[in-house]
């Protein structure tokens, strides 16, 4: 959190919490089911992720930021109708109570930012029919960035365990400094970029198409330096 705090300018923080959700589910005797790295969210699992993402993880992050003097506010998509989703239709896989974002209250987010508040968004949305929906954190970040691009000059930063997109997954120092669309296509065809990094970069280009200035993929510890892979 200290590294996030050091990052200059207005901020919105989006977090995950999958490992904590898996741990609590196991303690409660609820099996965690994953397909292609995505969680199957049945009714019992939805209760777990709502508790963990919207409660435990979110409020601990808010408390940590407050300790640093950051006026943070923890939110889910249901709060003040911040982010509405439709339940994902069943195709090859039934992901259960998983949401695809359809509407973002950009004016609300912009208002909070103008008040000097740092919104901390949990990866949960709602369908406006009384149901919470588990929603991918990268998607939440991308949708928030696209919505805020109408109000601000936005840089979207995806943080994960590596220093950026790697040329060699076994070499943590082989960070690709910049990737344009042509290079992205080539890296995918060569198998250099694969798995979960593909949708992350697809989200990045969707954000750029919607007016986001730039996207950076990096480690949390380097977020304040702007290091990593710049996507354009």
Model segments located where?
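C-terminal catalytic "cap/lid" subdomain
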Residues: 3-232
């Amino acid at each position: 959190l200290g590294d996030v705090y050091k990052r200059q300018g207005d901020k919105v923080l989006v977090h995950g919490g999958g490992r904590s959700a898996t741990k609590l589910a196991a303690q409660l005797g609820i099996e965690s089911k994953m397909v292609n790295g995505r969680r199957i969210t049945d009714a019992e699992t939805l209760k777990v992720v709502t508790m963990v993402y919207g409660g435990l993880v979110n409020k601990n992050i808010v408390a940590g930021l407050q300790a640093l003097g950051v006026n943070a506010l923890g939110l889910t998509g249901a709060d003040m109708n911040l982010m509405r989703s439709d339940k994902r239709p069943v195709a090859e896989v039934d992901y259960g109570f998983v949401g695809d974002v359809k509407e973002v209250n950009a004016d609300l987010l912009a208002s909070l930012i103008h008040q000097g508040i740092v919104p901390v968004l949990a990866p949960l949305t709602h369908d406006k029919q009384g149901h919470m929906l588990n929603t991918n954190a990268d998607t939440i970040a991308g949708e928030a960035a696209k919505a805020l691009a109408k109000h601000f000059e936005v840089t979207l930063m995806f943080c994960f365990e590596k220093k950026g997109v790697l040329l060699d997954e076994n070499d943590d120092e082989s960070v690709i400094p910049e990737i344009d669309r042509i290079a992205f296509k080539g890296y995918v065809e060569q198998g250099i970029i694969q798995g979960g990094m593909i949708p992350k970069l697809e989200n990045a280009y969707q954000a750029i198409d919607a007016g986001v200035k730039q996207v950076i993929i990096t480690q949390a510890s380097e977020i304040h330096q702007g290091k990593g892979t710049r996507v354009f």
